[in-house]
Structure formats: structure tokens, C-alpha cells
């Protein structure tokens, strides 16, 4: 769940099963599994918002089924909320670095105008936030997404993540 949230928030696309690894972390009485991306060529590139949601890829169905069978819906939602809070704290804690990166992304032609327009329309549809209208680059999309996340992270319904296009 946390991996899916990070992909959506960071606009990290195409996270099919062959583009990430599962790292087991052994503790005294349990094993925690963390998912780490290993392929970043689709970050902030795609115009289809669903491509930033790894749980929608057919290749990932076995893991999604495992999560559904092992975790309660309440736990899944709690993990999503926790991950958003962690991301917000990281954004605020690294504000200067993030701003510098975003500024360079604004002027870099990472994706086509069509993909930027399509993605901003879909995010606007989800958020109803006017700041997502008329954006010109993926850097601007990411900046507005981070700002939205920071200003709304206590709102557990933000981005209505269960909505599918």
C-alpha cells in the first residue's frame, strides 16, 4: 500500500512487477517486506493517471491479492494515511532541495504537452483544485501535487484514491 501511495504522489509510472524489488527486513519476531522501485524511466512522463497506480497493472495482481487477503480495509486505509504524512514530513524537511529540483523540472521538457494536459485534467477531476488547471510542465504538476498534499494531508479523503478512471 505504501509503495502504491509513493508511486502516485511522486508520479512514478510503470511499476509492473519487473520494475521493482521486494526487500525483506528481518526483525526479532517478524519479517517486514518493503517494495523498492528499480526503474525510473517513466517518472513524471505519462499522461494517464492510472499508470501511476501500480495496483492497476495485471502483472501485480498476485501481490494485490495477497494484500487483500492479509490486510483489513481499515489497515490499508491507515497505511495510506501514514504514507502521506511521511511524504509531507519529508517534503517539509527537505524543502530547499525539493524546490530546487522542481524549479529545474519546470523548464525541462520531460513529457509532451498532450500528456501534461491529460494528467492535469484527471488530477483536477479528482481534487477539484483549480491550481491543477493550465499547467505547462510535469515539474508544475509535481509542484502543485506536493502543495496539495502538504495543505490537505490531514484530510483522509484527499485524492480519492479508490476512484478509478
For the regions a protein language model found, what residue spans apply to each?
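Active-site acidic catalytic loop and adjacent metal/ATP-binding pocket
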Residues: 1-42
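C-terminal catalytic region of ATP-dependent kinase domains
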Residues: 27-165
Amino acid at each position: 500500500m505504501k509503495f502504491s501511495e509513493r508511486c502516485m504522489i511522486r508520479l512514478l509510472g510503470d511499476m509492473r512487477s519487473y520494475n521493482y524489488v521486494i526487500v525483506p527486513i528481518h526483525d526479532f519476531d517478524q519479517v517486514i517486506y518493503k517494495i523498492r522501485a528499480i526503474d525510473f524511466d517513466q517518472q513524471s512522463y505519462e499522461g494517464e493517471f492510472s499508470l501511476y497506480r501500480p495496483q492497476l497493472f495485471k502483472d501485480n495482481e498476485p501481490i494485490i491479492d495477497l494484500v487483500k487477503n492479509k490486510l483489513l480495509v481499515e489497515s490499508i486505509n491507515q497505511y495510506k494515511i501514514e504514507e502521506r504524512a511521511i511524504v509531507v514530513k519529508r517534503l517539509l524537511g527537505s524543502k530547499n532541495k525539493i524546490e530546487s529540483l522542481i524549479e529545474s523540472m519546470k523548464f525541462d521538457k520531460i513529457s509532451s504537452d498532450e500528456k501534461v494536459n491529460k494528467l492535469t485534467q484527471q488530477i483536477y477531476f479528482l481534487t477539484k483544485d483549480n491550481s491543477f488547471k493550465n499547467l505547462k510542465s510535469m515539474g508544475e504538476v509535481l509542484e502543485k501535487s506536493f502543495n496539495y498534499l502538504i495543505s490537505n494531508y490531514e484530510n483522509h479523503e484527499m485524492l480519492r484514491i479508490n476512484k478509478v478512471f
